[in-house]
Amino acid sequence: MTEIDYYLVDVFTSLKYGGNQLAVFVDFKNEISTENMLNIARELNFPEITFIKENQYDKIFNVRIFTPEYEVPFAGHPSLGTAFIISKYLLPKPKKSIILNLKHSNITIDLTSINDIDKSYFIMEQAQPDFITTYKHQEIANGLGIQLEVLNIQKPIEEISTGLPYIIIPVINLEKINQVKLDSRKVIEFLTLNKKYKTNSLTGLSTSLFFITDETFDKSNSFNTRMFCIENGNLIEDAATGSANGCFLAYLLKNKSTEISAIVEQGFQMERKSYIHLDGKIENNKYSLKVGGQVVDVSKGKWKV
């Protein structure tokens, strides 16, 4: 029986058992089939897991990302967590930048320190945003079954993607975002009606919901956020979502200022505090979307295939 090395990390946190969980599998011999990669994702039931499939001369690493439902072309916290494992365990010595070859595109991840990987910030440059569509506030309130007064009607509701699609939904304050409760059937109906569900979307992926407010638990942070998605027919909340925050950064650059630096808190309502650092600007009509955070080493082991 073959055994594969795997590692567990928490991403977007400096403390173990905070942030978002990730399992990283090292499969340079391609011994795990696509079917079994999905089976492993379902067995662990983490938001995502990754498989490092190839090391191209210590410069580019081919990586595949799976949720318990399907393979995804890009995801934020899995990219950062995988770069951490590569830096700490797979390279002869850490490098200032790592390139991950993902299904959607190549992602470059920079390290703020190569001398102390455990304290380094891992920062990814996300792809150019696709501003897909906007929604009326009443349409979102009716479609998701929430009260209109929960929404900040002074700010637009917009669907954006840098590899995965999210609807950015501004909420009036922290109290209201804490109280957000969604029904999975209602969300699936809304997504299906708008051709945003996996069964009828152009990409075969379901669009997720990203609620944001500029009131925070920790006053040193800039925004509080919550991300909800449908997975295997169930409504799931995510503790820290790098891809959603990249879309949110694009949203801020488009609607607020052409240069942004911010710290986003996420997962606070789940008791998994996460801190996502955003730095972005628009220059020559191009978006620079940098999303970063720290990664904590949790455990490692062997997986029997």
Feature annotation, model-predicted:
Residues M1-F74, L80-V305:
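Active-site proximal loop and beta-alpha junction motif in alpha/beta enzyme cores
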